[in-house]
């Protein structure tokens, strides 16, 4: 049995700090074999840079997934080209920098496939079909390992749920990112795929999805353009732990994780 820790969108320095504080102890105390972190907001709230990625890897990440905001920092273009552990959604054009899949070998010697796709409903830019892309990439990954974890970076709950059912029995786990709000629907689907619509965010607790709450409230009240700033203060780490049978690739358990911390 292997255990994978899946961490929702890391938001800026508060998110990175709480990852650094708790992920090493979680790995040790719970016997975590693999850590997957969505990094698309990890650099000052938007995008990722080489130094930020390195910080997350040193804190215990094995692979970094992303989404539509991964392109916000120009440094990410070279990072995606050079580091196969940093993923962009696989359903971007083939000549976009980087890759949407990776195969990670755990310390215990098991290989796990990671796939990152982006939804199309209410999302920009428009990408290729995540369903067809996922089916194609999974067929290729299964030639190496039956254990596959999919990060679906999408806005619409319905699209993520539909992808979960579409991939049931084909992958070990489908988990959602992007909305920064965790859902309470973790379950194992009938054919053995663990599913969670959204893992939430890892970032400032007293915020509106990572942004200073006063700015967002003012925006709603005045309906005028605002340049948002990332919040600070206490932070929360949100995600899930999934257990997978290495021989079959089927999930045997999934549970949500939420840890609060302060002093960041």
PLM region descriptions:
Residues 1-264:
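Acidic, metal/ion-coordinating pockets
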